[in-house]
Amino acid sequence: MIYNFSVENKIRLDEFLRENLPNCVKNQEISNSKIRRLIIAGSVFVNNSQIRRPAYIVFPKSKISVNFDENKFFYEKQPDDIKYEVTQKDVLFEDEYLIVINKPSLFPTEETIVGGQKRDNLHQAVIRWIWKNNPSLRNPPYVGIMHRLDRETSGAILFTKQRCVNNDIHKMFEEHSVKKIYHAIAVTNQKNQIKDSFFIENYMGRISPKSSAAKWGFVPEKNGGLYSKTEFKILNKSNYKNMDLFYIEAQLKTGRTHQIRVHLSSAGLPLLGDELYGGIPEKRIMLHSKCLEFVHPITKEQLKINAPIPDFFNKYYNL
């Protein structure tokens, strides 16, 4: 089904679709993450040009078309998410403006609708946590989503508690001034020497059909690919049940969907548990957001926030 729109006011593309697309779909809600996925997947065209940037600005008289299959869009199989509530030990940093949580694996960052039902998510869990600790509030507290972690990725993730810091934090992420360090366990059967440090840079986009599981890969810039770069460092090597394992530190220089997963797979080092990109099956994808480092937008303090390595990683390494 193709839906066509005409723009009346200057606005971000994702915000325009959030306001207008639900009116075309009867009895269905469309979450922010669904809107973002539609755009990144290449389903949205502005003036006949494919646009993959949710923050893209559209202007009056622009023509927008959206092409998607409603049945596949709304009625996906419900994943087996864990049940989770934030506890004090999960709070890595908190003040009146910001909160950083140690996200568990197998729990989505934000709301999605699967099989016609809303899934619980970390964003709502943080709202519940703040409200629980501020029972005098008459309405749910504000919590802003600044970035996202994949459902199976654990570790440090930042939310805002006041709208006044949103622009500064958004700008930090857009300008890549937030230092993001991940730890990962990758597996390989390559006989070639793996360098102790290396980087990968290329252009990325969705390579799977819209009717199948979302998969990203290398896409030329002229075809809508977005620049991506990751720096890698090998921290340790071992052998586990005849598998060559590498304990890796990854520093994101950009923040594309599945970026670390795609880059390591392209280097012959798919993440353990990441079957989508060639990894060996495991209970979870072995990727953890280890550290966020940034300047506090109000106090100007340099913050370095570390998330403890999950116990499950110790199955392979004594970390």
Predicted regions and their residues:
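RNA pseudouridine synthases
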Residues: 1-319
